[in-house]
Amino acid sequence: MAKEWGYADHNGPDHWHELYPIAKGDNQSPIELHTKDIKHDPSLLPWTASYDPGSAKTILNNGKTCRVVFDDTYDRSMLRGGPLTAAYRLRQFHLHWGSSDDHGSEHTVDGVKYAAELHLVHWNSKYNSFATALKHPDGVAVVGIFLKIGREKGEFQLVLDALDKIKTKGKEAPFTNFNPSCLFPACRDYWTYHGSFTTPPCEECIVWLLLKEPITVSSDQMAKLRSLYSSAENEPPVPLVRNWRPPQPIKGRIVKASFK
């Protein structure tokens, strides 16, 4: 069996390029954001998300993260505007987190690591499938939201309450009637750049929209995320507590801000 990628020493981010050479490409994510080097681009528009809560389908534990999956067979839950020149369909969202509250995000802002990072993955509906979209530099748009420790977020609890049904790798449960825009911060200001998926195969097909304002979650809520296992039900238990990729070289890419 081929070696499976993961986050451990033997199969972690430093090894991904052995199986997926593009992981050492010129447009890899995440990156470190240095705000003094980022220019405001007045041509960047506001972005809008119109999500249909009925398009939420299931929540699953794939051994790498917890993921909420949406029906993307037609234009039900859409992302538009911002740096995007087309409408993008919501496919899934997932999270990255660390073993403690002081780290876990993949992108960093002026050296700051957040407790977690939420990724809402959308694909360009001008392509006929998600698989086709992956082959194009404008194929996918990801909205990234930082989670910092503070007050509990009630809307996030809806996701966390479902985790008991998907404790171990391979578990999936119904998860319906959920509008992920309830997880957005009040401020829609964003940074944008061209990058990649932060997990293998690390395809370089992503327009990133990273929201400047984090949302707050409680330390107890983060602990609930860490209660998941990366092991299957019949295997020795391995906690799912470190699933972030470190920042990658920016290699001359330009990051733009929608705000001054």
UniProtKB/Swiss-Prot annotation:
S-thiolated both by thiol-disulfide exchange with glutathione disulfide and by oxyradical-initiated S-thiolation with reduced glutathione. SMART domains: Carb_anhydrase. The modification Phosphotyrosine is found at residue 127. Transmembrane segments: none annotated. It comes from Sus scrofa (Pig). Its main location: cytoplasm. One of its GO terms (biological process) is response to bacterium. Disulfide bonds: none annotated. Belongs to the alpha-carbonic anhydrase family. Inhibited by acetazolamide. Its EC number is 4.2.1.1. Reversible hydration of carbon dioxide. The keyword Zinc applies. The modification N-acetylalanine is found at residue 2. The gene is CA3. Residues 3-259 form the Alpha-carbonic anhydrase domain. The modification Phosphothreonine is found at residues 73, 176, 216. The modification Phosphoserine is found at residues 29, 43, 50, 55, 219. GO terms for molecular function: carbonate dehydratase activity; nickel cation binding; zinc ion binding. This is Carbonic anhydrase 3. The modification S-glutathionyl cysteine is found at residues 182, 187. It is found in: Cytoplasm. Residues 64-67 are annotated as: Involved in proton transfer. Its cofactor is Zn(2+). Substrate binds at residues 198-199. It comes from the Eukaryota. Keywords: Acetylation, Cytoplasm, Glutathionylation, Lyase, Metal-binding, Phosphoprotein, Zinc. InterPro entries: CA_dom, CA_dom_sf, Carbonic_anhydrase_a-class, Carbonic_anhydrase_a-class_CS.
